[in-house]
């Protein structure tokens, strides 16, 4: 592809040192820097490259690259040993000033694996608009991560986010008037170019054909039977087979008494029948490990209160139970209904018997009575709670803001670290010869929870119709 530079993303770091260190070396051997100027070693120097200086048509260009500063909230520390991740503000401006003074580039591009965000300084993982508003001496901010396809121009700087899945190419244009190497005038603009999936590059297709076929063969192999339909959207209305499966997997961890889990696929149907390996990516799309963490009963309740507060409103007649709003879809431009908050942070609990009263305010909705086996639940007792590595590291702020737990110091609370959850799913299917409704819906194992009062069900159904149609 002959890239001039590549930025490190959180899913690169997720692969671990063995992979991304090799990728960095391979890229470097081909003259391509792997950029992440805010991933710093204990001595303060960048772990990866931080800048690329190049010339095009006599114009000197500086490309500064940075990655997401929120890595610690998603990934286990063993994946990023030897580095820390600094906030992009004020670091990016400081680095721009240093490079501009030293190299005197005529064009400056800041490429970040960070989302567009809201521009109000509140979203640590998405600082694109924050940078657009504050940076000086920069022509383009190229961002990513949150899959929002958008171009924003402010004064003499453009933000470009091409979205996800190679559906668009971000296209920035700059017009310069130069005299004796000095910039007399400059203008920038940008747009997004739709990728035509029918126009295949035959050389690229040939180069990757054997790799494609190998992956295809692996993902199409049969792995077991599914005797019940799984619909991920059912997770938002209460207990459902899909979430029951995820809780069953989590509670299979040795010593786990309770599990926290959220739907990681927003709206997907996995129909009963013969499963292929590729279906496992629909059931569990991310590379999260399973951790077991010690929490008190009171902390469990507070975590659930925080989770459900991002998920539901305090219901009033003719209002919405689900915390939804109508707005424009950034990907399609069409108006639709959507959750205000990220559904992948809508944790419910397995292994407990509890209710969530939608008529009560935050802090008094969740009433836990027993464990799944009937043992009385105590606010003062300690429990082993299975959760993703993302959640244990502070992702979604459920532990920190919900229960006041210091997620920077979790080591004393972590009881066990297990394999990636998709691998646990695969092993479960092999051991159980498939996924069977009787096993995953066993309330003696996964417990039971529901929204109350029962009269709220009709309002929830209306909200679900707004979100997903009839």
Annotate each language-model stretch with its function.
Residues 1-197, 237-249, 259:
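Acidic, metal/ion-coordinating pockets
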Residues 74-83, 87, 94-95, 163-470:
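Catalytic centers of hydrolytic enzymes
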């Amino acid at each position: 592809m002959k890239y001039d530079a590549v930025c490190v993303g959180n899913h690169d770091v997720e692969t671990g040192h063995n992979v991304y260190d090799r990728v960095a070396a391979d890229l470097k051997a081909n003259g391509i820097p792997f950029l992440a100027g805010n991933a710093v070693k204990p001595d303060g120097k960048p772990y990866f490259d931080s800048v690329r200086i190049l010339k095009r048509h006599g114009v000197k260009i500086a490309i500064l690259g940075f990655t997401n500063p929120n890595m610690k909230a998603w990934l286990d520390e063993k994946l990023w040993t030897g580095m820390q991740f600094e906030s992009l503000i004020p670091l990016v401006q400081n680095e721009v000033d240093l490079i501009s003074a030293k190299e005197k580039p005529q064009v400056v591009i800041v490429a970040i694996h960070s989302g567009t965000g809201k521009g109000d300084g509140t979203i640590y993982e998405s600082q694109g608009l924050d940078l657009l508003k504050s940076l000086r001496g920069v022509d383009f901010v190229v961002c990513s991560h949150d899959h929002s396809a958008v171009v924003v121009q402010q004064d003499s700087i453009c933000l470009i986010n091409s979205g996800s899945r190679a559906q668009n190419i971000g296209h920035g244009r700059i017009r310069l008037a130069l005299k004796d190497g000095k910039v007399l005038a400059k203008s920038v603009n940008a747009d997004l170019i739709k990728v035509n999936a029918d126009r295949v590059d035959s050389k690229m297709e040939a180069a990757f054909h054997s790799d494609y076929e190998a992956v295809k063969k692996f993902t199409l192999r049969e792995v077991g039977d599914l005797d019940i339909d799984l619909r991920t959207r059912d997770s938002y209305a209460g207990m459902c087979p899909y979430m029951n499966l995820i809780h069953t997997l989590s509670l299979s961890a040795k010593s786990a008494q309770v599990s926290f889990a959220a739907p990681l696929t927003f709206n997907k149907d996995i129909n009963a029948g013969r499963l292929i390996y590729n279906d496992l990516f629909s059931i569990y799309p991310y590379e999260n490990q399973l951790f077991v963490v010690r929490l008190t009963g009171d902390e469990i309740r507070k975590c659930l209160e925080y989770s459900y507060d991002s998920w539901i409103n305090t219901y009033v007649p003719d209002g919405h139970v689900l915390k939804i709003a109508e707005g424009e879809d950034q990907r399609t431009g069409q108006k639709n209904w959507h959750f205000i908050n990220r559904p992948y942070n809508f944790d419910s609990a397995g292994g407990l018997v509890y209710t969530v009263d939608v008529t009560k305010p935050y802090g008094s909705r969740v009433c836990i009575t027993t464990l799944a086996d009937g043992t009385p639940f105590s606010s003062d007792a300690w429990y082993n709670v299975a959760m993703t590595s993302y959640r244990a590291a502070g992702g979604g702020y459920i532990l920190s803001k919900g229960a006041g737990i210091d997620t920077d110091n979790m080591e004393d609370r972590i009881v066990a670290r297990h394999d990636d959850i998709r691998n646990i799913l695969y092993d479960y299917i092999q051991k159980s010869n498939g996924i069977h409704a009787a096993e995953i819906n066993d309330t003696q194992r996964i417990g039971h929870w529901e929204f109350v009062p029962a009269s709220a069900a009709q309002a929830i159904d209306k909200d679900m119709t707004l979100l997903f149609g009839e």
